[in-house]
């Protein structure tokens, strides 16, 4: 594929989960931004098992006769990245842009992403300027970004921002990957030859609350660790060797102290022994837990169950007809 292959159609993929308050503004602003493009476009909204009225709103928008919207309805909540992969499976564009539904990253940035991608980049990432999140979210994101950069060797400043553009061959390569734990920005960068980042505006969340709770962030961290690299397993071996050496050294020291100071001194060191023992046992349990995470991922992949189940697709035929009329 030529690096400067022209972009004839743009697909926007937006995962939606309980975003009924923001959906009207999201649809209006995204459509307005896409109308500024010189290319044909489609807007794919993936309902990730919402429990509010998001499903009804998406269905109504997709059924609009003048709509460029396709609504993909999943039967339950599978997570943000699985929902995006469901959208990827439906796209027909040469350039695919992902966007969150909370409007913290404005859809008005879409034309700029398309313009940068036309310069020949496989992936166009973004960095949130003046990020409007809590200190906890900022700190957690910074730590995750550092961990990803060390594991992948690719220096990108903000892996957590989902406002990104991907060439079609990158999306097709990702669709051939069937692992259950998928982090799309990292997966895309493993296939990309040319990547870049641009700074985008970041607004405060106007509607609802973030769907990433503390437990979801912890789960995301484990997903990243286990799907990126096997380095933690190697580190476990090193840590285990270090603990064994430390334990042997400490045992020799205790024997020497007993010989020097007599059995009375050894009786007073029982609590020290227990403290050291608990430290070693704790380290073993941490290692076993991490090893269990890897085994669990292998088990899920071996079962080869689908990432998601699409209950219904609304508006696909209508969107194709609208594109034909515009041509």
Swiss-Prot record:
Its record classes its membrane topology as: Multi-pass membrane protein
The family note in this entry says: Belongs to the glycosyltransferase 2 family.
Entry superkingdom: Bacteria
Identification of the protein by name: Undecaprenyl-phosphate 4-deoxy-4-formamido-L-arabinose transferase
* Main location class: membrane
Q: Which residue windows are transmembrane per the record?
A: 235-255, 270-290
Gene3D superfamilies named in the record: Spore Coat Polysaccharide Biosynthesis Protein SpsA, Chain A
Pathways per UniProt? Glycolipid biosynthesis; 4-amino-4-deoxy-alpha-L-arabinose undecaprenyl phosphate biosynthesis; 4-amino-4-deoxy-alpha-L-arabinose undecaprenyl phosphate from UDP-4-deoxy-4-formamido-beta-L-arabinose and undecaprenyl phosphate: step 1/2; Bacterial outer membrane biogenesis; lipopolysaccharide biosynthesis
Q: What class of enzyme is it?
A: transferase
| Keywords linked to the UniProt accession | Antibiotic resistance, Cell inner membrane, Cell membrane, Glycosyltransferase, Lipid A biosynthesis, Lipid biosynthesis, Lipid metabolism, Lipopolysaccharide biosynthesis, Membrane, Transferase, Transmembrane, Transmembrane helix
Instruction: State what induces this protein.
Output: Activated by low magnesium concentrations, via the two-component regulatory system PhoP/PhoQ.
Name the EC number(s).
Answer: 2.4.2.53
Source organism per entry reads Yersinia pseudotuberculosis serotype I (strain IP32953)
A GO molecular-function annotation: undecaprenyl-phosphate 4-deoxy-4-formamido-L-arabinose transferase activity
Matching Pfam families: Glycos_transf_2 (PF00535)
**Function recorded in the entry:** Catalyzes the transfer of 4-deoxy-4-formamido-L-arabinose from UDP to undecaprenyl phosphate. The modified arabinose is attached to lipid A and is required for resistance to polymyxin and cationic antimicrobial peptides. Not required for full virulence.
Instruction: Give GO cellular component annotations, separated by semicolons.
Output: plasma membrane
């Amino acid at each position: 594929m030529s690096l400067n292959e022209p972009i004839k159609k743009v697909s926007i993929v937006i995962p939606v989960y309980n975003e009924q308050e923001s959906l009207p503004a999201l649809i209006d602003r995204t459509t307005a931004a896409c109308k500024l493009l010189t290319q044909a476009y489609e807007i794919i909204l993936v309902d990730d098992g919402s429990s509010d009225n998001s499903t009804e709103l998406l269905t109504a928008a997709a059924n609009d006769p003048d709509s460029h919207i396709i609504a993909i309805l999943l039967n339950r909540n599978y997570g943000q990245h699985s929902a995006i992969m469901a959208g990827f499976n439906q796209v027909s564009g040469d350039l695919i842009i992902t966007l969150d539904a909370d409007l913290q990253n404005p859809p008005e940035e879409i034309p700029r992403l398309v313009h940068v991608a036309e310069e020949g980049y496989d992936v166009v990432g973004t960095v949130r300027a003046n990020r409007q999140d809590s200190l906890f979210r900022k700190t957690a994101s910074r730590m995750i970004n550092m961990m990803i950069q060390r594991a992948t060797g690719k220096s990108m400043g903000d892996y957590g921002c989902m406002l990104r553009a991907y060439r079609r061959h990158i999306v097709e390569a990702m669709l051939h990957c069937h692992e259950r734990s998928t982090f799309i920005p990292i997966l895309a960068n493993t296939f990309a030859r040319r990547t870049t980042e641009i700074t985008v505006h970041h607004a405060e969340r106007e509607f609802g609350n973030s769907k990433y709770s503390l437990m979801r962030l912890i789960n995301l961290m484990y997903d990243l660790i286990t799907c990126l690299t096997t380095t933690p397993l190697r580190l476990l071996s090193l840590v285990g060797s270090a603990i064994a050496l430390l334990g042997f050294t400490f045992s020799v020291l205790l024997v020497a102290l007993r010989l020097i100071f007599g059995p009375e001194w050894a009786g007073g060191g029982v609590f020290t022994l227990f403290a050291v023992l608990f430290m070693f046992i704790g380290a073993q349990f941490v290692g076993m837990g991490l090893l269990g995470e890897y085994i669990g991922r292998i088990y899920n992949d071996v079962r080869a169950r689908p990432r998601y189940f699409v209950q219904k697709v609304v508006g696909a035929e209508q969107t194709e007809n609208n594109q034909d009329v515009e041509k």
